[in-house]
Amino acid sequence: MNKLYRSEKNKKIAGVIGGLAEYFNWDASLLRVITVILAIMTSVLPVLLIYIIWIFIVPSERDMK
């Protein structure tokens, strides 16, 4: 079973989107584009807050090993 973590090898800022992409077996670039579109559609703040919260809640890949 997959575990959700912040990716160390597929990250741009904190690895949140990369970790989600690995968890769902999706392309990280596609998920990043979807996230940016969602952020624009919701005036950025909700997506930014969720991202920041996930940085602290979701463990890092190296913490999982």
UniProtKB/Swiss-Prot annotation:
Has the keyword Transmembrane been applied to this entry? yes
Keywords from UniProt, A to Z, are: Cell membrane, Membrane, Transmembrane, Transmembrane helix
User: Per its UniProt entry, which superkingdom is the organism in?
Assistant: Bacteria
Topology term for the membrane? Single-pass membrane protein
Keyword Membrane, does the record have it? Answer: yes
Q: What is one GO cellular-component annotation here? A: plasma membrane
Annotated membrane-spanning segments are: 37-57
Q: Where in the cell is it found?
A: Cell membrane
Name by which UniProt lists this protein:
Uncharacterized membrane protein YvlC
Which organism encodes this protein?
Bacillus subtilis (strain 168)
State which gene encodes it: yvlC
